[in-house]
Amino acid sequence: MSQRTALLIIDMQQGMSWPSLPQRNNPDAESAIFGLLQHWRFRKAPVVHVRHISRIPGSPFWPGQPGVDFQFALAPLPHEHVVDKSVPDAFVNTGLGQWLHQRDIGSVVVVGVSTNNSVEATVRTAGNLGFQTYVASDATFAFAKKDFAGTPRSADDVHNMSLANLHGEYATVLPAQALMRMA
């Protein structure tokens, strides 16, 4: 990472840890995210916390619902930037790109959930906007789901396919420890 690098933490909210969700992979993702967060804070590097706010009444991410709140261990400090989004891509209608450019940030490390949704959407846009983009493979996770043909896919399958979609085209995908050594 040759440029000033921000850590983007995507949708690490209370609702993402509810037991009613489908089976997920990377049970240690929160620990890896916490390690990266501590590393960024120690270096006094920029951290951005992205929060999903649903436009669907009754959603766990509807304003005022407990699912909207950040997970306690990963909650932002007062000086850390918070971005509220209502679509998967953290750059759409949020000012995130402008905020990064105003601070001369040319590189981002993206972590959080879910790999195939908000993480992938945000990473694609970051890469398309010219940011040097990294994804921490062990600091992201996905949920099991059916593919377009109706075949059940494990959370690992969904996660790994999403990372394959991103690596080499929109981002460089590496484990958290490797990214900490580079930062």
Regions of interest found by a model, annotated:
Residues H49-R55:
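Conserved non-catalytic scaffold segment of RNase H-like nuclease domains
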Residues S2-A6, F34-Q38, F42-R43, R55, ...:
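Active-site-adjacent betaalpha module
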Residues L7-M12:
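N-terminal nucleotide-binding beta1-loop-alpha1 segment
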Residues G15-P19:
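Short acidic, Gly/Ser-rich segments with clustered Asp/Glu that frequently serve as metal-coordination loops
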Residues L21-H49:
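A short alpha/beta connector and helix-capping loop motif
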